[in-house]
Amino acid sequence: MKFSRFVSILVLFGLLTKVQGPSLTDFLFPRRCPRFREECEHRERDLCTRDRDCQKREKCCIFSCGKKCLNPQQDICSLPKDSGYCMAYFPRWWYNKKNGTCQLFIYGGCQGNNNNFQSQSICQNACEKKSNST
């Protein structure tokens, strides 16, 4: 009798955490933001202020000159080049994993992804050193 109550409470707890908050593995193995700090040409607008501003598997991290929502389990340097859908003209750098170099592209100013750096040196420090160590 006591055991079945205990199991029912565990099942209910498991269902509620999936609906209302982080999963049990997030408590046991907390995710961390990348430890990447760089001198920036200019500070970018923060896209978040805390983890609650981000989607389920993302954290609000200081990354590439501003606060951004990142999935700590995702390799940012593996993301494809994404100019976004706006029509601004911002020269930026992205890491091309196929040839292992940072390449210039034009960012439209909104959306896109986090494989988007202000300078070639910031891109290299974030991605090339990481890929050389693996």
From Swiss-Prot:
It is found in: Secreted. Monomer. Homodimer. Homomultimers. Interacts with SEMG1 (via 164-283 AA). Interacts with LTF. Found in a complex with LTF, CLU, EPPIN and SEMG1. Serine protease inhibitor that plays an essential role in male reproduction and fertility. Modulates the hydrolysis of SEMG1 by KLK3/PSA (a serine protease), provides antimicrobial protection for spermatozoa in the ejaculate coagulum, and binds SEMG1 thereby inhibiting sperm motility. Residues 26-73 form the WAP domain. CDD domains: Kunitz_eppin (cd22611). The gene is Eppin. SMART domains: KU, WAP. Pfam families: Kunitz_BPTI, WAP. The lineage of its organism: Eukaryota, Metazoa, Chordata, Craniata, Vertebrata. This is Eppin. Its main location: secreted.
